[in-house]
């Protein structure tokens, strides 16, 4: 019993230290890199020269930009043209805020353009990390390939995912996930952030502790995946873990 208690204590210490390191990283200058690229480079260049560079696309009226990420051959980021830190922002549950997940899904075409041929929807995933699971303090949705093992697991659970938020059997990547099926028409009308905040008990008060992902299924529906930070299981709620930026699924 003493050994079990000691092991439990060690796990807590490790989790707290890991979280502390993550927070320390977020308080440095490098955590503002993406925001500076958007606000000091992409947006001004588009407004003054009609050139989105270094972004791939800048849509000031729609409130977003798309940037090629330096990691992976096909990974892109969708980001707002104004200050939003991340999932903890109350702006994400405001109906007047752009539906960033839907916009990010539309931006998947940049992957195909870069690849030189169509990237199948089943190979694409969207993900945003929690406050402790990210390295940048500017809201960004990762548009990238899905891990083949995650793709297979979601395919196998197609019949088990309903229109309500329920635990995904077996979780993903060793972490617990909630899963919810949504239709395209639902997704167009309502942001996944609002679905999470309004439908999962106490989620609205703890949005910053959630990572959120989205994948398309073979029946053309979408699956939303939400994971919440849990220090005891060393889960920092980095939903990006379901992605493979090297795109093995395309080989």
Swiss-Prot record:
Highest taxon above the source species: Bacteria
SUPFAM superfamilies: HIT-like
An annotated GO cellular component: plasma membrane
GO MF, one annotated term: CDP-diacylglycerol diphosphatase activity
Catalytic activity: a CDP-1,2-diacyl-sn-glycerol + H2O = a 1,2-diacyl-sn-glycero-3-phosphate + CMP + 2 H(+)
Record bears the keyword Transmembrane helix: yes
Transmembrane portions of the chain: 4-24
Membrane topology: Single-pass membrane protein
Similarity comment: family membership: Belongs to the Cdh family.
Protein name from the UniProt record: CDP-diacylglycerol pyrophosphatase
Species the sequence originates in: Escherichia coli O45:K1 (strain S88 / ExPEC)
């Amino acid at each position: 019993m003493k050994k079990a208690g000691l092991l439990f204590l060690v796990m807590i210490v490790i989790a707290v230290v890991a979280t502390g390191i993550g927070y320390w990283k977020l308080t440095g200058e490098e955590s503002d890199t993406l925001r500076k690229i958007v606000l000091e480079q992409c947006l001004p260049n588009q407004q003054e020269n009609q050139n989105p560079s270094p972004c791939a696309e800048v849509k000031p009226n729609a409130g977003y930009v798309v940037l090629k990420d330096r990691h992976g051959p096909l990974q892109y980021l969708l980001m707002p043209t104004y200050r939003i830190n991340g999932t903890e922002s109350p702006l994400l549950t405001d109906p007047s805020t752009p539906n960033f997940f839907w916009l990010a899904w539309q931006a998947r075409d940049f992957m195909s353009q870069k690849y030189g041929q169509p990237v199948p929807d089943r190979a694409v995933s969207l993900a945003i990390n929690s406050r402790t699971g990210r390295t940048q303090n500017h809201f960004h949705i990762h548009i990238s390939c899905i891990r083949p093992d995650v793709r297979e697991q979601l395919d196998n659970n197609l019949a088990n995912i309903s229109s309500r938020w329920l635990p995904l059997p077996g979780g993903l990547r060793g972490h617990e996930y909630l899963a919810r099926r949504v239709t395209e028409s639902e997704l167009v009308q309502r942001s996944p952030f609002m679905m999470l905040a309004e439908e999962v008990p106490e989620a609205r008060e703890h949005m910053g502790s959630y990572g959120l992902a989205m994948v398309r299924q073979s029946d053309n529906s979408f699956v939303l995946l939400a994971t919440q930070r849990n220090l005891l299981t060393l889960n920092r709620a980095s939903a990006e873990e379901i992605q493979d930026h090297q795109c093995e699924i395309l080989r």
